[in-house]
């Protein structure tokens, strides 16, 4: 089972495209599709990415908000640093983590 999953994972064109584009996850392309269709995030916006690990959506959000915007990512798991984002480890339901997140925004 694991061998078959690995082989399919290696052949996945979205995974390869994400890697070639510098995105941490193939899910980055899903946010790009949503953004193209609904324009949810705008230049200069502040974004709180809840459950941000591994960071693909955070990377896309940074691209969209630009230099005037802010992106904060929160996850229970440690996420490797992403230039342009403030990343936190913790549960966003914890009032302290939520307050710290909002301070950055």
Predicted regions span which residues?
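Class I SAM-dependent methyltransferase Rossmann-like catalytic core
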Residues: 2-42
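Conserved class I S-adenosyl-L-methionine
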Residues: 44-53
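Conserved SAM-binding loop of SAM-dependent methyltransferases across substrates and taxa
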Residues: 54-66
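Conserved SAM-binding motif I beta-strand of class I
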Residues: 70-74
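Short loop/helix-cap segments at secondary-structure boundaries that form the rim of catalytic
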Residues: 78-85
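Conserved acidic residues
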Residues: 91
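Conserved Rossmann-fold cofactor-binding substructure of NAD(P)-dependent oxidoreductases
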Residues: 96-101
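Conserved small/polar residues in nucleotide/adenosyl-binding loops
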Residues: 103-105
């Amino acid at each position: 089972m694991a061998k078959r999953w690995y082989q399919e994972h290696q052949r996945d064109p979205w995974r390869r495209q994400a890697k070639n584009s510098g995105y941490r996850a193939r899910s980055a392309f899903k946010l790009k599709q949503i953004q193209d269709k609904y324009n949810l995030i705008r230049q200069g916006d502040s974004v709180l990415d809840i459950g941000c690990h591994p960071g693909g959506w955070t990377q896309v959000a940074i691209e969209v908000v630009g230099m005037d915007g802010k992106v904060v990512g929160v996850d229970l798991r440690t996420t490797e640093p992403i230039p342009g984002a403030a990343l936190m480890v913790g549960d966003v339901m914890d009032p302290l983590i939520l307050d710290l997140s909002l301070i950055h925004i």
